[in-house]
Amino acid sequence: MDEDLMGFFDFSKEFKRTEAPKGCISSNFVGLGTEKEKTKPPKQENLGTEYVKEIVDREKQNLESLGIGGSAAKRNRTLDDIDSDNEECYEAPDLRLDEEFYSKYYFDLNRDKTLPIYTQRDQIMKAIRENTVVILKGETGCGKTTQVPQYIIDEAYQNRQYCNIVVTQPRRIAAISIANRVSQERHWEPGTVCSYQVGLHRQSGSEDARLLYCTTGVLLNFLINHKTLTHYTHIVLDEVHERDQEMDFLLIVVRRLLATNSRHVKVILMSATIDSREFVQYFATKNGIPPVINASHGRKYPLVKFYRDQLKNMQWQEDQPNPDEPGMGSHGYSAAIKILLVIDNMERRTEGQSQRSYEENLKTGSVLIFLPGINEIDNMAESIDHVMQENPALKVSIIRCHSLMTPDSQRDVFASPPVGYRKIILTTNIAESSITVPDVSYVIDFCLAKVLVTDTATNFSSLRLVWASKSNCRQRAGRVGRLRSGRVYRMVPKSFYMKHMLEFGVPEMLRSPLESSVLKAKELNMGPPIEMLALALSPPKLSDIRNTILLLKEVGALYPTVDGNYVELDGDLTPWGSIMTRLPLDIRLSRLVLLGYVFNCLDEAIVMAAGLSVRGLYLQEAGFQSYEAYWMHYVFADGSSSDLVAIWRFYKTYLNMCENRIMQESAAQWARRYHISLRSLKEMHLLVQELQYRCNKLRLHPVQLQSCQIKDDRERALILKILIAGAFYPNYFIRSNKFNPDYGRNTYQVLGGYDPCRTVYFTHFEPRYMGELYTRRIKDLFSEAKIPPENMDVNFQVGSEKIFVTFKQTEDEMDQLNLIQVPGRILTDVYKAVRLRIGKQYRPIRVMELPHAIQYVQENKIGTVIEGQWHPPSKPFNAGLMALPSVYDKNMIGYITHIVSCGKFFFQPLELADSITNMSEHINSPKNLSHYVVDAGSITKNLKLLAKRVDDFQRAQVIRVETHSHQYPKFRVRFIDYGDIAVVPMDQLRFMSNQLKREYDDLPPRCFECRLALVQPAALTSNYNRWPIKANEMVRKIAMDGRVEMEIYSLVNNVAAVFIKMREGVLNDKLVEKNYARRSDEDFASIQDHDFRLRKQERSFHVPRAERKQVNEEYLRVSRLPQDADLSPPPMHKCQTVVRLKGPYSPLEASMFSTIRASACKTVRIDPLSVNSVLLDSNPQDRHDQLIVSASVTTSNNNQVLTVRGSTVMPNTHGFGALMALIFCPTVQIKCNKECTKFVSLLAGLGYNPETMEPYYEDHDVVMNLDVNLLEDDVRLINQMRYNIDTIFFKYEGEDAPAVSEGDRSIVFNQLRCLLSRLLSKDRCYIEPHSSNLDNVWEKLDNLEPQSEPYGKRAIFPMHTIPELQNEDTTARLVLQENCKRLYSWRTFDGVLQPLDCKLCNQRLETVSQLRLHLLSQLHRDREKQIGFQDN
């Protein structure tokens, strides 16, 4: 590299000061709530196919010289001589003799004469000899696929002429099975004369192959690489009617090469339902048209078709179907069931008139019902089940058939039904051609289908319901009549079928992404993509081509320019684009693989890409199976909140099973247990192997040096999420922001003050039902989620219809090893509970009406009834005995007795030391230790007893039996007064004497639980929001030193948030300095309690002692954990009323919104199969936005609801989303506030036209408003990262290999790793929200000097221009300080507050409560530091 490159990031150089851009204007909080211009999606310009005519006319001039359809010219040259485009090559070459080959293998010229195709053999061969292109139309089963290539090779054998035939198949399995079948028929060794190739896998020993069966993509890639057809003498394109995108592009290439350098290669097009007129016109020239040969045959059994209007006695209740609104109608299901009843009655009546009995007819009288999707299949099955209950005589066996069915279900499709039952197969269009069931005699066809349609402007796809084509319907009708005559019932009128239904379906090229075709056009290098795609059989719209090219520029496959000049409809191929053409993946998945190579996680990236490419990895099941499947998948996610990480982890498990040679049965059992399709997993495994092979061929290898290996799972988890964020930009979604100052308050109000991280609620329970009687029944509702009843408390609120269920944090620390890991502070049980509702919204329980309930409690003396009002029994509470800190205690001294983590440790106040010592001496007296435990069965869960701790016995409570050995039973116990847990053998346990029980049984613990305040684990150094080991060790060291002084921040639910004081400062701050923690807000309840404590402590000197005691007792009563009465419910026979509870709900259920303009104002939901389908605000105390990245996005038919698939929740690192956008976007404008003192928003995308100021790709422009401080140095670090990524792939002109050697690549990788660590480990200050109508407007930045571009126009990731920030104006700072003083002056006001504005944080404060809590927020405290304010 030259000196400019080496010194590019030398920060010692002087930077030129320039004027910053006129960016966003800060708005007040009220302004944030108004709709802005940016929320409106951009208008899309829809350009049609007008461009096609000019290009097609020009192409025709090239075809004029070729006589397609005329006689073949005399062959007097060899194939090797016709690679030139010279007119002299017009004459056909003489094919060389191949005597040696034919003498090497056995050739039997006797073909199967029973096949219908044989009668047309001579006509077919004559047409092939005399024409360049031949179209062959023959029904399925006529023999065209296997026989026509053999006819050609037989004729070549007879003439001893060289021939080389390639036959394309749309599916891998077809190519393999047909090749093997032909080899078997001809008695050739597999892979010799006849061979196959799928992907890069070619049958071994195929050097002599003269007949190759391959997938469409194999031939297409071969022709693109060689740019000639002359490697083959005959090209047979089978199943051309399917019109997938690869086939349509292959037709373009074949026709172009026929017209240029391959004029004497023979092309045969074959299909069962081909639109011969369309193909004839496509290959026609002035010299003639290709001949069409029909090789169809008659049916063995008759087929009768019925239409809706011909079924007069069905009494249809609906209007005519609407051509523009496909659907089954409200009575579609019942109409189909009527037909089933008619079929059954008809066969019963004709039993005596035919030779077949009714039972025999049932065996061959299966019914195939074509439905558009899985939901419709489920609805139809439910409707049939309902009718069967009403008509016991109708006995049917229902089989579901769709692309995601399990292998067992596939076998059921072909199996005979039980004796006396009729088989009914409910199927999607998969049974049109892929599955043939011989015993089907009836088809009920709703004439509907679902097709995947992609909007190229947004790159969002949707599964749309459409009317099936007539071709589809003919294929469906062909499924009947294999064993006897058949009937087809089409559920549309005949006139509708004839007039409104299309003859053929819409080709894939007109409804699917064009990225692959555009990249292939670039690789073919025969003109711009627009000129190639205009030659398609069905050319796409110009707007679709334009959007596709813009998308390819966005992902780095194309440069924005051609030869250095910007071209909207073209771009030079980048190294990334060249690699993408060689990977059998979607472009974003290819980008994932490329970034895996960059960050040395290639194998992981390949596995995730393969998993996303294979359909049906997860089995789709209903009911409890669906609930269980979700959690089995969640286990593999391992707390990462990532579908992609789950894929990688369960593939690793599968691979280990394969490597350890675990039996096939074990693998099948494992797959069933985790609800994974073993068939799809095997398919994924093959794709992983192919991708690894292709990457190896492309010289994409992981760096093997030890210094480049990822250190641990924590670093790998972070890098994998960075790969995902980079690969799927701009599929960025933000979990709804929480700038509403009442967010925390509202959350707690919904739950009646209970902890939202542990509580869910039901609705629709009227207060009159005396809910405390049914707590156990309510707990039983969670049995499906396997949540033990003792792990929850059920509470009610007076006058409310809600039921609150609060889950307990397990007492057993070993549960941290639980298979289900969830992120953040929320308990796993909350996720389990909310997931229950997704499967079933209503939960019934049986209750008594009020008069009967009152009578019941009075008879059984449960609680008290006062003036007709029932008061359930409650446990006594003595605040004076609690070890908890008083509301007036700011600091406490004592001992840390047990440490789980920085987020959970136990503290004994020094003031209780004497009483604890006395109690210990009393307990350990010989008299009180004489009550030995001799029977392990007498030890029950939650029993209080004495257990040995170190040298003495202490109070303990049994958690569970640890071992069941009769000789050495052990028990897991929690020491009540110390907080620790231990496994204690039975001989170290003692029962409490009656005297000890009276004295200590009801005595509250002599310690209380604590956690560190205003900090949480740093995402960069922790997994699952768990505290790093080194952080916990710092707490242990302090505890071992003896007495500890703590400052109490708050007390909520008996847990104190504290600051631990050290000689060097405060532990909380030290953890932040060492990057073990980051600063964090407290949740609403904690801040509210802190404010309450502050105000009480400020006035404590003026409060009498008695009043202080009373205030503290009430304070501790409110702060304690909820406890229910846990009463036995009334007998079921007395509970005659059924209440349908709705829920459970959590107020932390989060919504999210898209960051790109095309998705503005659209509802976003997560795929129900995703591990993130239960999306909760896992850190409700954190006011920052959190990024969610999606591998793909689908949209509803009305284009208003987006479904996120393959989602990953990014680390809760403040500013993570903005940093990822800056690293991986094509270009960005960083916008400042009006004073130019800070960056406030990003506008990322492809940029804009400097002449018109119009954005290049407005639909995909991303706007991100910053909520943390981003500095100029951060952008410089990001520019270094972008430079390093480009360096890895940079090639010198004329070179095939990158300029970076393997050794240099390791240096680049370690630099990237170091830069990432520096970027993400910063503890960023909060900034106030800014929002402006200019956020989404690209602005001219002539006053900013652009950054130097080391790679010029060849940069995939060009350098970002960095606006220069100004120092904050002193006058403005004084104004903000004055505003701050005014806010503090109103803090103690007790009246009604006039609304105030916090100018520091850009927020409107409506009440004193809002004001107080805002002043304690991390945002406000950070802003105070930034302006140098201190409250006196």
Swiss-Prot record:
It holds the Pfam family Helicase_C. It is found in: Cytoplasm. Residues 125-292 form the Helicase ATP-binding domain. It catalyses: ATP + H2O = ADP + phosphate + H(+). InterPro entries: DEAD/DEAH_box_helicase_dom, Helicase-assoc_dom, Helicase_ATP-bd, Helicase_C-like, P-loop_NTPase, SNase_OB-fold_sf, Tudor, Znf_C2H2_type. SMART domains: DEXDc, HA2, HELICc. Residues 936-999 form the Tudor domain. Its main location: cytoplasm. Residues 342-525 form the Helicase C-terminal domain. GO terms for cellular component: nucleus; P granule. Keywords: ATP-binding, Cytoplasm, Developmental protein, Differentiation, Helicase, Hydrolase, Meiosis, Nucleotide-binding, Oogenesis, RNA-mediated gene silencing, Spermatogenesis. ATP binds at G138, E139, T140, G141, C142, G143, K144, T145. A motif (DEAH box) lies at residues 238-241. Its EC number is 3.6.4.13. The keyword Transmembrane does not apply. GO terms for biological process: dorsal appendage formation; germarium-derived oocyte fate determination; global gene silencing by mRNA cleavage; heterochromatin formation; intracellular mRNA localization; mitotic chromosome condensation; oocyte karyosome formation; oocyte localization involved in germarium-derived egg chamber formation. Probable ATP-binding RNA helicase which plays a central role during spermatogenesis and oogenesis by repressing transposable elements and preventing their mobilization, which is essential for the germline integrity. Acts via the piRNA metabolic process, which mediates the repression of transposable elements during meiosis by forming complexes composed of piRNAs and Piwi and govern the methylation and subsequent repression of transposons. Involved in the repression of LTR retrotransposon copia. Belongs to the DEAD box helicase family. DEAH subfamily. This is Probable ATP-dependent RNA helicase spindle-E. The gene is spn-E.
